[in-house]
Amino acid sequence: MANKNEIVKLTDGVYQIKYYWLGIANVYAYLIVGSERALLIDTCYSITGIKKYVEQITTLPVDVVNTHGHFDHIGGNAEFETIYLSKADREVAGEHSDYNALRKMIDNYEEKNVLVRYLFIIKTY
């Protein structure tokens, strides 16, 4: 497993965008570039800034299709205007965006000895 972000050209007009997330796993998105539009399959995590990778490949308008509603597939959706997600997965997306679900995920990281650093908001005047 490559431990870096990269764009891999699979064939003419088809690309894999690899994102190495939190030092523990790769997540992937796929871009298919047509003559008038491009189709992005999944958008990884919201922190990815996946649009910057897409813009390195094409300037065409981009439609997004999510394979399912888990946050590692829909996290970057807000960077795009047209998103396709099944109705059933809309509810899943909500569950996976829930604070308690995210808290459970972080707890799982800690159990596996993954370093989790907490940020605190400190007001200064």
Predicted features along the sequence, with ranges:
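Short N-terminal signal/transit or membrane-insertion segments
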Residues: K4-W21, S97-N113
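Conserved beta-strand hairpin/beta-sheet module of binuclear metal-dependent hydrolase folds
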Residues: N5-E55
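Active-site HxH/HxHxD metal-binding segment of metal-dependent hydrolases
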Residues: I47-Y125
